Amino acid sequence: MLPAVNRMRRTEDFRFAARTGLRRANRYFVLHVVEGEPGAGLLVGFTVSKKVGNAVVRNQVRRRLRHIMRDYLDIPAAMVVIRALPASAGTSSSVLRTALHKEFVALGLADE
């Protein structure tokens, strides 16, 4: 589970990140990133629609992504929204981890 200070909860934050942030996509998810002010910390939010699957599948995908994001809590001030796509439902955690790392490297938020 992500620490409470790193969880995005407000609808306005999700909307702001999705509309104004940098966007990177692959077949498993769409990543929206807004770089924040230094010292603001990292906020992470997840959206998993019904297109991904039933409630059990959606929660499994969300839990996997949340667990993967724990490794990236050292990212400097940013707002990150991960929107899961249907292909993420049948994908292993290791594949999702690799895909997410590639997107963070492309955005300059993680080292190779």
Task: Give a label for each model feature.
Residues 1-112:
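Positively charged, solvent-exposed patches that mediate nucleic-acid binding
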